[in-house]
Amino acid sequence: EVKANGRLRVTNLGGMRAENGETENVRVYTRGGKVYEGTLQLCNASVHVNGDYGKTERTFDTTEVLLDEAVTSADETRALGIETGDIVCFDPRTRVTASGYIKSRFLDDKLSVGILLGFAKYLRDENKQLPRRTYVHVTVYEEVGHGGAGSVPAGVTESISVDMGCV
């Protein structure tokens, strides 16, 4: 939602929680193909003047995206092409350390895709043939809750799913 002050109210798709995203950099992807940056912050973000700063529950109702643009009204934000329904994505902060350790937000889905692509690369590099037609099927539907079975090719009788496992 584009708020009267030009900032954005967001709602989550999936498991991201506002308290995990506070002060994180975001990108706003418009339907017109433009990308803008901003930061998710508490609506009254100044610890110096907000006496309830530490007590305020962080939810998507108490936080907002402050755009890295000179906008102070809904009209100015909309003039950039930003509208309700555009996608706001958190910076995953992906890093590969000197020792090869990979750290990132949202790594579960990336790792699952990496496993499938690694398997496909192994088959190609080793010139291996599987005994039946095999598809690597990747969906992006997990976060919206309706699964990916609708795009599985006809005739598929077996499936192996690779996903993260909460412990």
Where are these regions (language model features)?
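N-terminal hydrophobic/helix-forming segments and targeting peptides
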Residues: 1-167
